[in-house]
Amino acid sequence: MRIILDAMGGDNAPLAPVMGAIQAAKDFGAEIILVGRGEAILEVLKGNGIDTLPEGVEIANADDVVDMHDDPARVIRQKPNSSMVMGLKMLSDGKGDAFISAGSTGALLTGATLLVKRVKGIRRAAMGPAMPNKAGGKTIILDCGANAECTPEFLLQFGLVGSLYAKKNLSVENPKVGLLNIGTEDTKGTPLQKEAYALLKDAGDNGLINFVGNVEGRDVPLGAVDVVVCDGFAGNVLLKSIEGTAMFMGSLMSKMFKKNLLSKLAAMLVMKDIKAFKKLLDYREIGGTPFLGIRKPVIKAHGSSDALAFRNAVHQAMDAVNSDITAELEQMLGSMKENGNDD
């Protein structure tokens, strides 16, 4: 298995992706191709006391870099020799099994769609991060920003691909799928939610997914469902709200434990649990967000990812390769089309 990694993408590149790749190769036995400016990559290695490339790690030179100001729609034509575009081309050409980048989300999504292509029958790829929940598992939220405007058919497909991903990657036997709404009643929401509800319910009645109805935002961190379906605008707001709440709770707890001597002693007694709590909410432990609906695994790492985050993104990519959902998803979509359930 070969994982292609954009060595120039993200706020901490090339240091973080290079060192994360080396750690991942050591810990997981992965073969990793670092795509980027060869001299810059070698300087990182030298600066960290590494004279030669570790076993399993190789460099594919790319002279250019995609930055956040580049127009996503023009990146492929204007920067064909960039680390991101070259990495996606390598994935499309079969020179690797998955691609990871912490670069521009828009450019990565556009490049993945045009170069790697969507799964046959999929109308839009979606960003599907897996968030920890109160039930002890993870909840996939999709879409989380790739598609601000959606049709009911898009939301139906998000439910299908999210359910398959939860089965294959999160080992959930019968994932519960819910539609994000302002209430649980089936009459709630805009025309988009009402029409999507009907399509998802029909898919549930036909045994394609385990659709449990509408869910509210507060139900998501509680683990009421395994997959939350929504448009990219609502999903991104939901995700950022959960992240902000987690940061607030962490800051509040830190202040409480530093208030006086007694609270500091209490903190010492529960320090192990505090560290476990922080780890649970640490985005670096997850790795990145997959673009679901693309033919091969493409993972968007957080822009501020450090070496640990890249290491875990490699592990996440390996899991995605091992639990490939493409064939099963194509079969499901083909069956729906034959039965007239896909408009």
Q: What is the predicted role of each segment?
A:
Residues 1-43:
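N-terminal phosphate-binding or glycine-rich loops at protein starts, especially the Walker A/P-loop
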Residues 90-109, 188, 193-195, 199, ...:
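Glycine-rich phosphate-binding loop
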Residues 14-16, 28-33, 39, 51, ...:
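Glycine-rich phosphate/diphosphate-binding loop of Rossmann-like nucleotide-binding domains
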Residues 6, 35-36, 58-60, 101-103, ...:
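Short beta-strand segments
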Residues 50-96:
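Phosphate/nucleotide-donor binding subsite
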